Amino acid sequence: MEFYQREGTTDQKVIEEVVKRNVYEHKKTGFLLKNSPVWLDLGGNIGTFACKASAAGCKVISYEPEPENYDYLSRNIERNQSNATPIKAGVVAGETGTLDLYVCKGDYNKYRHTIFKKRGRAAITIEVHNFKEVLEKYKPNGIKLDIEGAEIDILDSMEPDDWPECVNQVTFEYSFDIDPSIARFKRIVDKLGAHFDIVHHRKIDWAKEKYEYWPAAVMVYAKKTD
């Protein structure tokens, strides 16, 4: 795979993490991209996940709301002849409509744009789609979320019976810098555990009130075994 990228930016870090280090698979638990024929990619960025999953034989629907990232996403899908569809929008727990996206300052950071207000950041208006409506429309088997905190409300809104039977794998980076509450994280993974057979993440001290470690993010892998 080859990628159009912006030199001297987080693009190189993303390529290293997703393509080379393969952070969205967890082989010890059998969490593999190929196990889900259709992936919903939330936080498409420049297309590393979309192209990686396509190379594993999967179809991908990739959401990316930030215009420049979306342009790179589209170009990289085309460059790698990936079986992926880019969509210029975000996905949220709330209603379909529009929201402000607070974009990163400077020339380096291209992947920390967020719907949560950040001091000193400019905002752009983006289209957003409701998560449950997106699930109903595309009926994915796998879901990947890396959306800078928006995953928390989405996952917290999902009761065990809300997950469609077609979904057999979910992976996400949980953003403790947006909400450091360990109790909320536990509630979310417990609800996932009531639907999925395996929920894997690094060890957490459940007795603590807040997550105060660096990096302030934890990878989670949830999967069905049958």
Task: Describe the residue ranges of each PLM region.
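Phosphate/nucleotide-binding beta-alpha loop and adjacent structural elements of enzyme active sites
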Residues: 1-226
